[in-house]
Curated annotation (Swiss-Prot):
Name of the protein in question: Apolipoprotein C-II
Function per UniProt: Component of chylomicrons, very low-density lipoproteins (VLDL), low-density lipoproteins (LDL), and high-density lipoproteins (HDL) in plasma. Plays an important role in lipoprotein metabolism as an activator of lipoprotein lipase. Both proapolipoprotein C-II and apolipoprotein C-II can activate lipoprotein lipase.
Signal peptide positions (record): 1-22
Region annotated Lipoprotein lipase cofactor, chain positions: 78-101
Post-translational events: Proapolipoprotein C-II is synthesized as a sialic acid containing glycoprotein which is subsequently desialylated prior to its proteolytic processing.
Family the UniProt entry places it in: Belongs to the apolipoprotein C2 family.
Annotated Gene Ontology cellular component terms: chylomicron; high-density lipoprotein particle; low-density lipoprotein particle; very-low-density lipoprotein particle
GO biological process terms, semicolon-separated: lipid catabolic process; lipid transport; positive regulation of phospholipid catabolic process
Pfam families reported in the protein's UniProt record: Apo-CII (PF05355)
UniProt region (Lipid binding), positions on chain: 66-74
Species of the source: Leptonychotes weddellii (Weddell seal)
GO MF, any single term: phospholipase binding
Length: 101
């Protein structure tokens, strides 16, 4: 289960990293005939678009709302516990610093 999320994370980061670099704008060649390089380049960008849409579909398919709710619940419980223990620690520290008066 962890490997699947790691794979999704890597794919999403790869897509985001490539999107940050900017969209590819094909340049107008002076020659009317396309060379082998431009054909390979167009083919690569076509495959890249398919892979990008597949990664996005995989991410949307694996996004679980129940997992999101569980994470929010755990966060709320942990912050409540931390604030409670921080209050207890502060009270103990103040009573130690004040001493018996």
């Amino acid at each position: 289960m962890g490997i699947r999320y790691l794979l999704v994370l890597v794919l999403v980061l790869l897509v985001l990293g490539c999107e940050v670099q900017g969209a590819h704008m094909p340049q107008q060649d002076e020659a009317t005939t396309s060379s082998l390089f431009t054909q390979m380049q167009e083919s690569f960008y076509g495959y890249w678009g398919i892979a990008k849409s597949a990664a996005q579909g995989l991410y949307e398919k694996t996004y679980l709302t129940t997992m999101d709710e569980k994470i929010r619940e755990i966060y709320n419980k942990s912050t409540a516990a931390v604030s409670t223990y921080a209050g207890i620690f502060t009270d103990q520290l103040l009573s130690m610093l004040k001493g018996d008066q």
